[in-house]
Amino acid sequence: MSDLEALHVRAKALNLNGLLAHWGEAAAAGWLATLIDWEEQERTRRSLERRLRAAHIGRFKPLCDFDWTWPKRCDRAAFEALMSLDFLKDATNAILVGPNGVGKSTLARNIAHQALIHGHTVLFTSAGQLLSELAALDSDSALRRRLRHYAGPRLLVIDEVGYLSYSNRHADLLFELVSRRYEHNSTLVTTNRPFAEWREVFPNAACVVSLVDRLVHNAEVLAIEGESYRLKEAQERAEQRARQRRKAKS
């Protein structure tokens, strides 16, 4: 394929119909390749901005600022494998398990941002927000529409499963969503509870075993152990303020 033919293919992919209608004239111009480059770059930029707004990732600490020495246990190689996004190609899931404050949400947001940069659709939500929203819908048609909304993204991040307890209906709704996404799109879950304790998160729910089974099938489970980094930062801030007060008095 010649360079000019390759430019024609790119122009068709961009639906530049006006340019294509005058291709014979445009082909002789020295600016044709630059024009198509500009259009592709601008569409890529606008697509990323649109997907960033829709993803609701929020502000987060970039990996360059993450203290890998703080967790007592965290398989960095396994996390970096998740950052490669290979699990999205296979439509498998990822689970980050660990106590409060060890960086699960930060790591999940970095994976979500990486997926966005690479052109994937992403949606980030907390378990509480997701399940409260679904449970509040008062018609089957509205529920089906909202389930399709959450089933659609290439990556759905459900943060903070286990921080609250939920009813049987909440459990059924989560199972329905996970089932819709199963082997079609990837789901990333952060939780402070090992799976053996999920019956306490969804007490008396009959679907808990099936829910966990669908989530963990072929999933990458990354366990993180350690003390709360947020507590560490709070203690450091308190100590700094105390030093400043002592200095002001001296």
Model feature map: region roles:
Residues N15, F66, D159, L215:
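Short, conserved catalytic/metal-binding motifs centered on acidic residues
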Residues C74-G152, R199-V201:
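Conserved P-loop
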Residues E25-A29, W38, H56-I57, T69-K72, ...:
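Conserved phosphate/pyrophosphate-binding and hydrolysis machinery centered on Walker-type P-loop NTPases
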Residues H8-R59:
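Interdomain "pre-motor" coupling segment immediately N-terminal to P-loop NTPase/helicase cores
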Residues L16-L19, Q41, F87, L155, ...:
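Generic structural signal for secondary-structure transition and capping sites
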Residues S2-L7:
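Extended, charged alpha-helical coiled-coil/arm scaffolds that mediate oligomerization and mechanical coupling
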Residues L48-A81, K89:
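Clamp-loader machinery-focused feature within the broader ASCE/P-loop NTPase space
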